[in-house]
């Protein structure tokens, strides 16, 4: 549906691309303000990937409303849309659809509420995500709806450390691998933890729990609607 809409509304698609180009120009102008601001912006962009494109579902905007982050007029995005984009855009290097939600998480006698991201193994490369201990889940685990989870460092500290959520865990991440947690009343096994990336204008990935996309759709979100599609574009020089 999304791909069809883009092809059927070439003018609107062109304006959307223009909006993204203008947005990039604004970032470039902002970077030029000063050395300090430049370094901060560059570090934020590099932490998530300098060739990253984020596609979000949205609603129809009126005249004068800006276009941002590839947000379009489709009310929902689905896995079929993600696959269609991957199959039709030749410059795509990797793609990682995401289903996001907030859920109650219980472990080790601790009870908290945090962000849950259901995604695919390519998320690691698409978002420059480092693995601190254990491993990220595999395509095979995603396909069989495995109840496995990868924890950000803030989550590790909240559930298994001193609860400070400081970005520097007070517990050895390796000791968390193999532990059980409950997400929305469902048992998951921790198979890995991510390296700290810190917070930025793009948000923090330290206070997130990652689970396989199919698992999230089946057990947590109850829907096949995607929250976001992360795409990395191949560099022209490659």
Question: Model-derived features: where do they sit?
Answer:
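N-terminal Sec/SRP start-transfer signal
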Residues: 1-22
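ATP/adenylate-binding site constellation spanning eukaryotic-like Ser/Thr protein kinases
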Residues: 8, 42, 50, 153, ...
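Residue-level recognition of transmembrane alpha-helices
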Residues: 17-19, 32, 185
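Hydrophobic alpha-helical membrane-associated segments
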Residues: 22-25, 29, 33
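Hydrophobic, regular-secondary-structure patches
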Residues: 35-115, 119-125, 139-140, 217-218
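Mid-to-C-terminal secondary-structure elements
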Residues: 122-141, 146-238
């Amino acid at each position: 549906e999304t791909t069809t809409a883009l092809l059927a509304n070439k003018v609107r698609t062109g304006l959307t691309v223009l909006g993204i180009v203008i947005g990039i120009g604004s970032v470039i102008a902002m970077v030029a303000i000063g050395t300090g601001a430049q370094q901060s912006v560059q570090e934020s962009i590099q932490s998530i990937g300098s060739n990253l494109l984020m596609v979000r579902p949205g609603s129809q905007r009126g005249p004068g409303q800006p276009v941002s982050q590839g947000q379009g007029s489709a009310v929902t995005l689905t896995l079929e849309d993600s696959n269609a984009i991957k199959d039709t855009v030749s410059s795509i290097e990797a793609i990682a659809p995401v289903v996001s939600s907030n859920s109650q998480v219980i472990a080790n006698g601790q009870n908290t509420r945090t962000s849950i991201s259901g995604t695919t193994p390519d998320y690691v490369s698409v978002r420059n995500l480092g693995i601190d201990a254990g491993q990220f889940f595999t395509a095979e685990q995603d396909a069989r709806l495995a109840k496995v989870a990868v924890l950000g460092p803030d989550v590790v500290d909240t559930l298994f450390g001193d609860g400070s959520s400081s970005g520097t865990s007070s517990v050895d991440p390796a000791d968390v691998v193999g532990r059980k947690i409950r997400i929305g009343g469902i048992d998951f096994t921790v198979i890995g933890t991510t390296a700290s990336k810190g917070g930025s204008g793009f948000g923090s990935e330290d206070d997130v729990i990652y689970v396989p996309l199919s698992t999230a759709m089946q057990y947590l979100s109850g829907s096949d609607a995607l929250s976001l599609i992360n795409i990395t574009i191949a560099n022209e020089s490659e």
